[in-house]
UniProtKB/Swiss-Prot annotation:
Pfam families from the UniProt entry: AIRS, AIRS_C, FGAR-AT_linker
Keyword line: ATP-binding, Cytoplasm, Ligase, Magnesium, Metal-binding, Nucleotide-binding, Purine biosynthesis
Record text on subunit structure and interactions: Monomer. Part of the FGAM synthase complex composed of 1 PurL, 1 PurQ and 2 PurS subunits.
InterPro entries listed in its UniProt record: PRibForGlyAmidine_synth_PurL, PurL_linker, PurM-like_C_dom, PurM-like_C_sf, PurM-like_N, PurM-like_N_sf
Native source organism of the sequence: Sinorhizobium fredii (strain NBRC 101917 / NGR234)
Pathway(s) where this gene product acts: Purine metabolism; IMP biosynthesis via de novo pathway; 5-amino-1-(5-phospho-D-ribosyl)imidazole from N(2)-formyl-N(1)-(5-phospho-D-ribosyl)glycinamide: step 1/2
Gene: purL
Residue numbers binding Mg(2+) 2: D118, D269
Record flagged with keyword Repeat: no
Primary role: Part of the phosphoribosylformylglycinamidine synthase complex involved in the purines biosynthetic pathway. Catalyzes the ATP-dependent conversion of formylglycinamide ribonucleotide (FGAR) and glutamine to yield formylglycinamidine ribonucleotide (FGAM) and glutamate. The FGAM synthase complex is composed of three subunits. PurQ produces an ammonia molecule by converting glutamine to glutamate. PurL transfers the ammonia molecule to FGAR to form FGAM in an ATP-dependent manner.
Protein name, UniProt field: Phosphoribosylformylglycinamidine synthase subunit PurL
RNA-binding is among the record's keywords: no
Length: 742
């Protein structure tokens, strides 16, 4: 059978597929001939940044991925971590940045759908979702439209599918004007002895297509996700996928039912690069070839070419290697759920990826070189430059109370209620903590006391100032947020969003952030078990803020002892665990400097990982023993914002003692490794004794009570006034009534 080609391969065609001249030469040397148009599309999909990680692979190997609880680390659809009693949590975070900018509703919706498939492909039932969203400046003409579409897409898919959204982030910065970020996280529960993998095994076994039919939506999506944007962005709208959450719900139930029959040898969801990537990954991992007959692929559009079928990113589809004797039983399950079930190929022993279409062989390629032996680059990067510290006399002053009121009602520090009230946070009936606290918490169904905590974190302005410290801080804050609920942090997933890696200064950000993330994960016993890299987040040469989002999972052994951020009662002591001298001192890169004075200079705060570990373990023990009544991590906005958020959540005021140092640094400094905790009067002595034994500074800095917040010698601000400011910004902005400078 001869290889059929339908289109001449020209330099322009090669370039339009995102392949560099040296990569095309590598293809010619690899296969010994000119590729067909379909083969060119396959190489483009598999060798692009989105699928091959060719610029990041070298550095990702530096991350710790193993631990006593890790069942499966990176390399599968999702990470798997043991949570005792024969149960495990399966989770991952992935980006859908480029599609969401072009078509916000469908881009965000299919981002949620894709991450849910990654989880249930492993045999887990999804129990929680989060999303970390970054938008451009609020006064940019597209921002309101993008926020509306993305939030509706996230909610529309997640709500219909039936998974609670328990946490996330929403932030604004002009650096995201041309490239928003939509990072979707999902977690599911499974039995530790019933995990399903994507590695194909056995020769001559049927390769089965499952789920929805294939259309032209998403053709070239993975290639688009590996390129910068320019003026032709609107032309890329057809490359955005279209999702159907109700079909995905049926696919979930059908897959989990099928998995109980013993029919599944290997299974892989069709995400980026669709049928191409799923088939190549299954075969390459198992050292097997794959032959596909595209005439047997269920399609919903007429006259689809082999190129379109191989690169379509139509949603709600799976590929499976099946035990032949289970074919009828498996087919009956999918027919019952109204889904397609078609044997579209077989495994082979020749390590070839062979595609047949209308009697022609349209592709015949070496499968290993397409998959796990794709090109790998060691791109040049520049040494890191650390900004000079701010001089003591270079800290601009402001009224402490006025600054607090402005910050709680600002774009980046106000309540996200407008967002999360569009998400179903309670479906499944296991949600214990909803968005707005330090972490979302979900009860483990079937267990009397066990719960899981989830958080996603990164502070891009820190990463921009110092990628190494910023990488450490993203991990530390995620670990701290989990700890603040009483959870033992188990493991993390990363979503590394950066600009163009071909620019040495951007590659430097990536390299140093990875080094910081790796060091923090090792110090905190918080391995990375899954993740995603999203590069080329640039428009016309303007890159985003470096945004390595960390999503973490923690285990709460007894959710009755879980901590919350809201003050529990009046007349309780407020203590600052991990307090530096003077309550706070690091004002550079703070939201105070950015949002009150418009300054983003100076170094990021240093993260002392030994201190972080010591304080976090101490606070977690206090929570487990019922010695504290409220806990909140101290991060963006410093002590002032932490106390204000605790007051707003509870309706109870607070009085904080006047610091001995500069009140601006004390209240708005963003020193790391700190928790605000409250303790009832009858427990103070016990807590102080523990702190003394542990060698931990735990000063009493104030007291709860009243209906206002007073910071040192500043004027009081009523809790109602704080709450009104906190709740007003988002609905006012989305209603179109907000002045741009707010």
């Amino acid at each position: 059978m001869t290889i059929s080609n339908t289109r001449p391969i020209t330099p322009d065609l090669i370039a339009s597929h995102g392949l560099k001249p040296d990569e095309y030469e590598r293809i010619l040397n690899l296969i010994g001939r000119e590729p067909t148009f379909t083969e060119l599309g396959i190489f483009s999909a598999m060798w692009n940044e989105h699928c091959s990680y060719k610029s990041s692979k070298k550095w990702l190997r530096m991350l710790p991925t193993k631990g006593p609880r890790v069942i499966q680390g990176p390399g599968e659809n999702a990470g798997v971590v043991d949570i005792d009693d024969g149960d495990c949590v399966v989770f991952k975070m992935e980006s859908h940045n480029h599609p969401s900018y072009i078509e916000p509703y469908q881009g965000a919706a299919t981002g949620v759908g894709g991450i849910l498939r990654d989880v249930f492909t492993m045999g887990a039932r999804p129990i929680a979702a989060m999303n970390a969203l970054r938008f451009g400046s609020p006064d940019h003409p597209k921002t309101r439209h993008l926020v509306s579409g993305v939030v509706a897409g996230v909610g529309g898919y997640g709500n219909s599918f039936g998974v609670p959204t328990v946490g996330g982030e929403v932030e604004f910065d002009a650096r995201y004007n041309g490239n928003i970020l939509v990072n979707a996280f999902a977690a599911g529960l499974a039995k530790s002895d019933a995990i399903f993998y994507s590695k194909a095994e056995g020769v001559g076994l049927p390769v089965v297509y499952l789920g929805a039919k294939t259309g032209r939506d998403g053709v070239g999506g993975a290639t688009m996700a590996s390129a910068e944007f320019d003026e032709s962005i609107e032309e890329k709208r057809p490359t955005v996928q279209v999702g159907d959450p109700f079909t995905e719900k049926c696919l979930l139930e059908a897959c989990l039912e099928l998995m109980q029959t013993g029919a599944v040898i290997a299974i892989q969801d069709m995400g980026a690069a669709g049928l191409t990537c799923s088939a190549v990954e299954m075969g390459a991992k198992g050292d097997l070839g794959i032959e596909l007959d595209l005439d047997k692929v269920p399609v919903r559009e007429e006259h689809m070419t082999a190129y379109e079928m191989m690169l379509s990113e139509s949603q709600e589809r799976m590929l499976m290697v099946l035990r032949p004797e289970k074919e009828e039983e498996a087919k009956a399950i999918f027919v019952k759920w109204g889904l397609d079930f078609a044997i579209v190929g077989k495994t082979t022993d020749d390590l070839r990826f062979r595609i047949l279409h209308q009697g022609d062989e349209v592709a015949n390629l070496p499968i290993k070189e397409l998959g796990d032996e794709a090109p790998e680059y060691d791109r040049p990067w520049t040494p890191a430059k650390t900004p000079s510290p701010l001089a003591t006399n270079d800290i601009p002053q402001a009224d402490v109370a006025e600054a607090l009121l402005k910050l709680v009602g600002s774009a980046n520090n106000s309540s996200r209620r407008w967002v999360y009230e569009q998400y179903d946070t309670l479906i499944q009936g296991n949600s214990l903590q909803l968005p707005g606290g330090d972490a979302g918490v979900v009860r483990v169904e079937g267990h009397a006391t066990k719960a899981l905590a989830f958080s996603s974190d990164v502070t891009p302005r820190y990463v921009e100032a110092d990628p190494y410290e910023g990488g450490k801080q993203a991990v530390a804050e995620c670990w701290r947020n989990l700890t603040a609920t009483g959870a033992l942090p188990l493991a993390a997933t990363d979503n590394l969003n950066f600009g163009n890696p071909e620019r040495p200064e951007i590659m430097s950000q990536f390299v140093h952030a990875i080094k910081g993330i790796g060091e923090a994960c090792r110090a905190l016993d918080f391995p990375i078990v899954s993740g995603n890299v999203s590069l080329y987040n640039e428009t016309n040469g303007q890159g985003i803020l470096p945004t390595p989002t960390i999503g973490g999972v923690g285990l709460i052994s007894d959710w009755a002892r879980m901590a919350r951020i809201r003050f529990a009662a009046a007349d309780e002591a407020i203590l600052l665990a991990g307090a530096p001298e003077g309550m706070g001192s690091h004002i550079a890169q703070s939201v105070y400097m950015r949002d009150i004075h418009g300054r983003t200079d100076g170094p990021a705060p240093h993260v002392d990982l030994a201190h972080e570990r010591k304080i976090g373990d101490f606070v977690r023990d206090l929570i487990a023993d019922g010695l504290v009544t409220a806990v909140h991590d101290c991060s963006s906005g410093g002590l002032a914002l932490a106390v204000a958020e605790m007051a707003i959540a509870s309706g109870i005021g607070a009085t904080i003692a006047a610091p001995e140092n500069d009140p601006i640094a004390a209240f708005y400094g963003e020193d790391q490794g700190r928790y605000v905790v409250t303790v009832a009067a009858d427990k103070i002595d016990a807590v102080a004794a523990r702190a003394a034994v542990a060698g931990i500074d735990l000063p009493v800095i104030g007291k709860t009570g009243g209906d206002s917040v007073k910071l040192g010698d500043a004027n009081t601000v009523s809790v109602n006034e704080l709450r009104s400011a906190h709740e007003a910004w988002f609905p006012t902005y989305m209603g179109g009534d907000l002045a741009p400078d707010n």
